[in-house]
Amino acid sequence: MPPRSTMIFALAAIVSLAGSSAAQGRGGPQTPLPPGQTNDPFPQPIAGTEGVITVTLREFASLPDINGVAARAMTLVDEPTSRRIFVSDMHGLLYVITPDGDTVSQFLDLRDPKWGVPVQSRGRERGLQSFTLHPQFAQAGAPGFGKFYTYTDVSDQTPAPDFTTPRDTSTHDLVLHEWTTRTPGSTAYDGAAPREMIRWRQPYANHNGGAIAFNSTARPGTADFGLLYVGVGDGGSGGDPLTLAQNLGSAFGKILRIDPLGRNSRSGKYGIPASNPFVSTAEVVPEIFAYGVRNAQRLGWDSRNGAMFMSDIGQNIVEEVSPVTAGANLGWNVWEGSYRFVSQRAVRTDSVRTDPKVTYPIVEWGQIDPLMLPSGQSASVGVVVYRGTAVPQLTGRLLFGDMPSGEMFHVSADDLPKGGQDVIRRVLFLTGAGSTPRTFLDIVKEKTTAQSRAVATRADLRFDMTATGQVFLLNKADGTIRVIER
């Protein structure tokens, strides 16, 4: 494999890098870094052709535009009983889709004033961040019947927040709501206004929450069943200037775990599981499950062994996918991936993965890897462990990706790496008979051109897996939901 410098030069000759911060080390030419520091800790680029898995990508359904703008699809959750698909649009809408993809219905518009949820969706990172269904959503008579949860940036700042930061000023609030529909099988929400559960006062405009999810492997009667995991960003800006991620007295930069049906929290609006790792530790937020998080975009579980994983967006150097266990310190902002964080320009090249108290990534990659150059940006997304058989070439693979470039990657789920990018391999997509393997960004570009939209420059890839093992791909540019097939 040619050295990174050769590959970057070759790609730069065919890819326009105007305006790309990745092209010149994030922000244009800069002074040389001191010895022992680098903005590129990976000597070999991700393999471009070796170990590529090719799958077919089929258009499944389309979401409607909002005022002439494509839906910003963020999260997909299935309801296993009916096999219906729920999908969120970051503008503030939820849709429900029939199992065959033929019928798309608007289930809920959070923006309707009667709900009292003033969705703040300006900018790339704000809006309806995530949602999930309670595992008892379709189980009549169960405590979680009809309940689902939304995680939303809002423009109001009342009532008073449950969690704040030391910063005097703020940009907006982030709110976790519980909704209860009377008829879960309906195509439209028929419940009352939502119940506010938790409110965070956001110090900066970015890193607004992330993923919320229930453990997909937990079964009724097990300790983790019905407990909600909540990814909370480090407050934003850059470099965690308020040092919140390592502060156990703060709820920012964490993965929280709560019982949405309980009431033993300080506010009385939700429960704190007795099994949470810091529940008995003084001066520590008892909701914390893991800490040292920058911007957790997705949470995933392995159905074979229950292992939990997180995709966490890096600063300017390293993207990562990490294992998550109770009480884990995931490193940020002392570490960016396996490397000691220095600044927004650099990490250290010495003392790699040397702190035994830190849980390091299973896999990571450089933001200036040649595969990221078409979008000029990089951000971790995923993560799915595929144990199905319908797409046998993916069986036993852990799937993750890069959000802007649309690259999907795979590694072995049964022989997990210990950091680095050497074993990362690509997943490329066919779109029909006679088609050639392409990246997701290439496919989205083609679609936006056909739709007479502005040609997409980012894929804004998101993907989720249903209980039946179908993997669906989402994006913010063309309103199209796609499913992976053999």
Language model: regions and residue ranges:
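Predominantly five- to eight-bladed beta-propeller fold
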Residues: 166-177, 243-263, 322-344, 348-349
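Acidic, Gly/Ser/Thr-rich repeat motifs that build Ca2+-stabilized beta-propeller blades
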Residues: 24-239, 298-301, 306-317, 377-415, ...
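Extracytoplasmic, non-cytosolic globular domains
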Residues: 244-259, 287-325
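Bacterial N-terminal signal peptides
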Residues: 8-18
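Sec/Tat signal peptide C-region and signal peptidase I cleavage site
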Residues: 19-23
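Extended hydrophobic/aromatic segments used for targeting, binding, or gating
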Residues: 96-98, 104, 266-271, 322-323, ...
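Blade-edge beta-strand/turn elements of extracellular beta-propeller
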Residues: 44-68, 102-122, 178-203, 224, ...
